[in-house]
Amino acid sequence: MRGPKPTLQEIVLDLCPYNEIQPVDLVCHEQLGESEDEIDEPDHAVNHQHQLLARRDEPQRHTIQCSCCKCNNTLQLVVEASRDTLRQLQQLFMDSLGFVCPWCATANQ
């Protein structure tokens, strides 16, 4: 191309009819040999399910955002609990547990 704008004469298209479909080999011909490193033995195998269950029992920090039951101000709590304990706390929230902000707590005393 010469000049700032392409012209039709400068564009060269090399079009060939492609009527014949050529097959493509999609088979992988790779062969793997047996190796002692690749064989998982029960002593060296990692049990991921056991690790996940153990992690559930570990206490983790969770941020809970709720409203004051008196003035509806937003409260933010940080708790450290296991997954099961957090579920119990969630049930308490759904049932009858209410939180009071520090301002409403001191005003009512």
Curated annotation (Swiss-Prot):
InterPro entries per UniProt: Papilloma_E7
Example GO BP: symbiont-mediated suppression of host innate immune response
Subcellular location: Host cytoplasm; Host nucleus
ZnF start-end (unnamed): 68-104
Motif segment (Nuclear export signal): 86-94
Keywords, ordered alphabetically: Activator, DNA-binding, Early protein, G1/S host cell cycle checkpoint dysregulation by virus, Host cytoplasm, Host nucleus, Host-virus interaction, Inhibition of host innate immune response by virus, Inhibition of host interferon signaling pathway by virus, Interferon antiviral system evasion, Metal-binding, Modulation of host cell cycle by virus, Oncogene, Transcription, Transcription regulation, Viral immunoevasion, Zinc, Zinc-finger
Chain intervals for the UniProt region annotation (E7 terminal domain): 1-41
UniProt record similarity statement: Belongs to the papillomaviridae E7 protein family.
Complex formation: Homodimer. Homooligomer. Interacts with host RB1; this interaction induces dissociation of RB1-E2F1 complex thereby disrupting RB1 activity. Interacts with host EP300; this interaction represses EP300 transcriptional activity. Interacts with protein E2; this interaction inhibits E7 oncogenic activity. Interacts with host TMEM173/STING; this interaction impairs the ability of TMEM173/STING to sense cytosolic DNA and promote the production of type I interferon (IFN-alpha and IFN-beta).
Name the record gives this protein: Protein E7
